[in-house]
Amino acid sequence: MELIDSHCHLKGFKDKGELNPVLDRAQAAGIKRLITVGTSPADWVTYREMHREKTGSIAYTVGLHPCYVNADWAASISQLSTFFMPPF
């Protein structure tokens, strides 16, 4: 059986240079794909880049977490379509 982690936040690991060891541990545990969840425009580009670099193992979503909604929420929402991707 192949497992998918359907909700994780990988940006902190990437920022600390720890992404590859995290992916190695996930694979060793039987997790074949991770879906990293974008919560604000501040992480959307990072997650798209992770997906492009690790297409077989990382997918991503973009959205606004209620804690990150501010006065510019409409501008953020208007950017969402630039992050659409075909299904993996």
Predicted regions and their residues:
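Mid-domain alpha/beta scaffold segments of enzyme catalytic cores
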Residues: 1-88
